[in-house]
Amino acid sequence: MNPSVLRSQLEAYLPQGTRDRRQQQRMLELLNSSAQPFSRSNLSPGHFTASALVLDPSAERLLLILHRSLGLWLQPGGHFENGDENLEAAVLRELSEETGLLQVEALNPDCQIFDIDIHNIPANPSKGEGPHQHFD
């Protein structure tokens, strides 16, 4: 993933309030300061992840997945991988890996960012990971 592509998408994102503006700024700072902002080994402060919001055709139901390590129901998503050329590729790969969905109709065909979040991830000693943040 080319950081300049994500930077352009983040700069085009319209924050929804003060918290959103702060998170947008922190994401841009991570892109500007980290040599590997997409690497899951980047734990200080963290790294970028990508997720999808999946609705049924009537837009009445939302797909959530139980995250076993965290014990939370979350939208499908995960870490960037080396072969991910852009945000859309990462989202579609994660969606396929986690749900088995291979064909989806994008409501947002340009894959523009419509929501951002920075959330804390607790240490996972079994993976040798300390606490960090996901910039999603």
Predicted regions span which residues?
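Acidic, metal-coordinating catalytic segment for phosphate/diphosphate chemistry
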Residues: 12-51
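Active-site segment of metal-dependent pyrophosphate-handling enzymes
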Residues: 100-136
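Generic N-terminal amphipathic, Lys/Arg-enriched alpha-helix
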Residues: 3-14
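Conserved Nudix-box catalytic region and its N-terminal flanking loop in Nudix hydrolases
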Residues: 60-104
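Short acidic (Asp/Glu) patches
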Residues: 34-38, 48, 87, 117-125
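Histidine-centered active-site/metal-ligand motif
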Residues: 47, 67, 79, 130-134
